[in-house]
């Protein structure tokens, strides 16, 4: 399971020109589920997302988590994070999990965050979405439950 975390001052996601999820300060999360991922990957990544210290403290050091600041999260599924671009000019998606598995683990990840008391807005699974965000920094991190990077 892979995630792109972006520290934002605000973000929202639209489907068919209708806003379906919006947040204030916090994290924008693009989440991709790969074949072989399971509930343990969702739990591990949710814990890391909630606890990663990417917000500045009074001294300007990244020493506070989204939990610490009472921030919000906007989680959007993105199967293209499982793309293999090593050969040719067209990405391959054979590593992406099947839609039913991916949706289940996407929802599990979101539920894990909500169980921690975090406010989580979402996109719509398998929909064509437009994501709008204001990067803060910019500060962006790549997470992988298999620790590839």
Swiss-Prot record:
Xref: InterPro entries: Daa-tRNA_deacyls_DTD, DTD-like_sf
A GO biological-process term: D-amino acid catabolic process
Positions occupied by motif Gly-cisPro motif, important for rejection of L-amino acids: 137-138
Enzyme Commission number, as recorded: 3.1.1.96
Alphabetically ordered keywords of this record: Cytoplasm, Hydrolase, RNA-binding, tRNA-binding
Location(s) in or outside the cell: Cytoplasm
GO cellular component: cytoplasm
Source taxon at top rank: Bacteria
Gene Ontology molecular function, alphabetical: D-tyrosyl-tRNA(Tyr) deacylase activity; Gly-tRNA(Ala) deacylase activity; Ser(Gly)-tRNA(Ala) hydrolase activity; tRNA binding
Reaction(s) catalysed (UniProt annotation): glycyl-tRNA(Ala) + H2O = tRNA(Ala) + glycine + H(+); a D-aminoacyl-tRNA + H2O = a tRNA + a D-alpha-amino acid + H(+)
Family: Belongs to the DTD family.
NCBIfam families: D-aminoacyl-tRNA deacylase (TIGR00256)
Biological role stated in the UniProt entry: An aminoacyl-tRNA editing enzyme that deacylates mischarged D-aminoacyl-tRNAs. Also deacylates mischarged glycyl-tRNA(Ala), protecting cells against glycine mischarging by AlaRS. Acts via tRNA-based rather than protein-based catalysis; rejects L-amino acids rather than detecting D-amino acids in the active site. By recycling D-aminoacyl-tRNA to D-amino acids and free tRNA molecules, this enzyme counteracts the toxicity associated with the formation of D-aminoacyl-tRNA entities in vivo and helps enforce protein L-homochirality.
Domain statement: A Gly-cisPro motif from one monomer fits into the active site of the other monomer to allow specific chiral rejection of L-amino acids.
Subunit details: Homodimer.
Protein name per its UniProtKB record: D-aminoacyl-tRNA deacylase
Annotated source species: Syntrophotalea carbinolica (strain DSM 2380 / NBRC 103641 / GraBd1)
Lineage of origin: Bacteria, Pseudomonadati, Thermodesulfobacteriota, Desulfuromonadia, Desulfuromonadales
